[in-house]
């Protein structure tokens, strides 16, 4: 399977629960990494063990982002939660930020694993709109360079044809962008 990295923050005593952090996408994670680590330390000091996931193809995990998919990332969450359930019998909480919050919500709606709570920070609410925002970053960065301007529609076509594109220093593939685009709150009414 895909190898991925986790960082764990343990409690000095038996934890009240174990919180698993589901990260945001791309530069959003890099910009908030210190904040997330500090919050995880605070959770641990308050009696809540915490694990931060670097999804396959991101951070310190193996693989390339262009080869990632939502299915792979959900397997990363599943394996992490399954391992924690085997190791300790405490409630499990998914904590997600931005895209990670939406992925956590989607995972909780579809998973057979017992997830006791969700902690969602600034969740995106529409995958298609979020992908458009990501692709606009590419359009904006290319606008200052010579050559014909590229539109989000053209980028979507390239991704759909299996090409990878670079956005803000990250090479992304069509499968992941299609997966993110398909996320919709309308499909998650089972949690309401």
Q: What are the residue ranges of the model-derived segments?
A:
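Alpha/beta-hydrolase active-site loop signature
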Residues: 26, 55-60, 125
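Active-site signature of alpha/beta-hydrolase-fold catalytic machinery across serine-
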Residues: 106-110
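Short, surface-exposed "cap/lid" segments of acyl-processing enzymes
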Residues: 11-54
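Alpha/beta-hydrolase fold nucleophile elbow
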Residues: 85-98
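Gly/Ala-rich beta-loop-alpha elbow adjacent to hydrolase catalytic centers
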Residues: 95-104, 122
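Catalytic nucleophile-loop/oxyanion-hole region of alpha/beta-hydrolase
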Residues: 58-88
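The alpha/beta-hydrolase serine catalytic core
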Residues: 114-192
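A short loop-to-beta-strand scaffold at the N-terminal edge of the catalytic core in hydrolase folds
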Residues: 1-11
């Amino acid at each position: 399977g895909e190898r991925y990295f986790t960082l764990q923050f343990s409690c000095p005593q038996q934890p009240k629960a174990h919180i698993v952090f589901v990260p945001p996408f791309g530069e959003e994670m890099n910009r908030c990494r210190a904040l997330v680590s500090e919050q995880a330390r605070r959770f641990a000091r308050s009696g809540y063990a915490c694990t931060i996931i670097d999804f396959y193809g991101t951070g310190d995990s193996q693989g390339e982002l262009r080869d990632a998919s939502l299915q792979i990332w959900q397997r990363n969450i599943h394996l992490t939660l399954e391992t924690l359930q085997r190791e300790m019998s405490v409630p499990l909480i998914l904590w997600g930020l931005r895209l990670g919050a939406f992925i956590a919500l989607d995972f909780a709606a579809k998973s057979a694993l017992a997830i006791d709570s969700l902690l969602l920070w600034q969740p995106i609410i529409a995958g298609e709109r979020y992908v458009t925002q990501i692709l606009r970053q590419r359009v904006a960065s290319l606008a200052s360079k010579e050559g014909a301007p590229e539109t989000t529609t053209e980028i979507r076509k390239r991704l759909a044809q299996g090409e990878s594109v670079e956005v803000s220093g990250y090479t992304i593939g069509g499968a992941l962008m299609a997966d993110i685009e398909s996320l919709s709150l309308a499909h998650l009414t089972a949690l309401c």
